[in-house]
Amino acid sequence: MSVFETDSRLPFTAGIVAIVAVLGGAAAAVLGAIFTPVSLITFLYILITLLLLALAIYIASQLPGYLHSSYALDRNALVIRWGGLREIVPMAEIQRVIAATDLTDGLRLRRFPLPGWWRGQGRHPALGKLFFYATDGLQSQIVVITPDRNYVISPYDAEGFLDAFNARYDMRPTQQVLYSRVEPRYMSWQFWSDHAAHFLLLFMLLAHLGLVALATGRYPSAPAQIPLHFDAAGIVDRMGPRTQIFAPVFVGTVLLLLGIAAGIFVYARRERGMAYLLWGGGVAVQAMFVVTIVMIAFA
């Protein structure tokens, strides 16, 4: 089987530069949160930091695919390798290969906007869906057309790839190969398609962000002393400094992280009901802390 590598230098460099830039922005947001008087602006800095960290993690997670990408050919199949992913395309199903420059008219493509980042999905009026596994621009890409799926690839030695493809295509297959897609175990985890889990985690996170926003937004105008405890008659029997408004935030953050981790742990053990219970309880806990801040900060 002949293997044709991609040129991963540009996407890898672009990814590293992007990660450094994003982390620099996150660090600047952290400094802004530290040196700005506590207010809703502080919450915005925190939110920006979290979003930038999530973006950096996403970019880093894509780099192995660009670094470890190649296309292998024999008389029976074309194997597209992208990180731990394998797309095995039977040679018998390939109808033809064309230059990607022939498809520029009407092509729509969703990809991450970094140089050399051509992993994504597109659509063309004549061919339908296109699956991009490329590290170079359209001028260097090759489209592999089959009845069901179309692949866009960019071997570094495009001419050598086409010569090898044509030679093997003319020889015809020696055995029947079925299309298959081999994914790393984590990519086939049921969690990624579990909308109920996504819904619960999203609501737990939003409830916690609401808790932080409420505390930081109320702090500047809160009195110097705020009620911390009420007796059975509803009368305040203990006061404390207004910095105590952040106690529910701290406890809520710890419980949020523990709840997410515990839920993922039991979910991985195929106990989805228990994971739902943990995450649903997490939503209720965060809502309870919101009520707590309202009671002590607005009393």
Q: At which residue positions do the language-model features occur?
A:
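Hydrophobic alpha-helical transmembrane segments
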Residues: P37-L52, D237-R242
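Transmembrane alpha-helical segments of integral membrane proteins
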Residues: A28-V30, T253-R269
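Non-transmembrane, membrane-adjacent beta-strand/coil modules in membrane-associated proteins
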Residues: M1-E5, R81-N150, M239-G240
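Juxtamembrane boundary at the C-terminal end of a transmembrane helix
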Residues: F289-A299
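Conserved beta-hairpin
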Residues: A56-L103, F230, I235
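Cytoplasmic juxtamembrane regions at transmembrane-helix boundaries
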Residues: G263-V285
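Active-site and channel-lining beta-strand-loop segments
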Residues: G217-I245
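N-terminal membrane-targeting/pre-transmembrane regions
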Residues: M1-I41, F132-T135, Q139-R168, R172-D194
